Amino acid sequence: MVWPFSRRSRKSIARIEVTGVIGAATRKRMLEALKEIEERRFPALLLRIDSPGGTVGDSQEIYTALQRLKDKLKIVASFGNISASGGVYIGMGANHIVANPGTITGSIGVILRGNNLERLLDKVGVSFKVIKSGPYKDILAFDRELTDPEKGILQELIDVSYSQFVKTVAEARHLSEETVRSFADGRIFTGEQALQLGVVDRLGSEEDARRWAAELAGLDPDKAECITFDEKKPLLRRLVPGGSSAGSGSMSGLAYPALAIPALNATLEWLEFERSTSGVPLWLYRP
């Protein structure tokens, strides 16, 4: 597509904000925005991340798209209040990373949770009859405890995903995998500590990151306009109070536009995310 304002774009900085838990809705929005940014030939992208992470596959797809785009423009990530786990992974797709001294980041690792309701079901007299093609077809079933072989299978899955995370951080930050593993044990740390560990490049605000992006693109930081690519919300969600999701991450892609209480809206979305990701490996910091 030929954009009528491409000349303006070449003198401006694109901006995308990633907030909330990363899921399918985040991925869809990000990929669409990155495609438009590429077509409009922006020279730089400011990637604002304020997310505790989310699903593994969606985080990986966003990272891959950023990697492809990095050959065509400069990308500077700005870590906000929290940029942990999958939020860190996405940030690895940038050329440079800026964090506030007090940013909560880290939580490099993988978590997988399932629910065991066996005792509750016994109390209410509910049981399930299962017919399956193999011994592991109902792994993480909520009506029974995991067997030792099942725990081994799931641990192997977690270990593979963890190794992928460590390798990406090591390559992006020019660190050895051994060094990354020394602090990639799920712990969180501040932006100041992240700088000491080599996870970020500088300490500073989003404005500092914007100015750096402008300089890298050969633009005047005092004159370069920043164009934000917001989530495209349906008209109803824009008109109804509380109609926007808890964050642009819109955890499961579901929203509750009829609710006028943002806190309740956010709680319902979180519960839906918990339900939909039970038994799914996550790059997510759970406070």
Where are these regions (language model features)?
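N-terminal organellar transit peptides
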Residues: 1-85, 92-100, 111-287
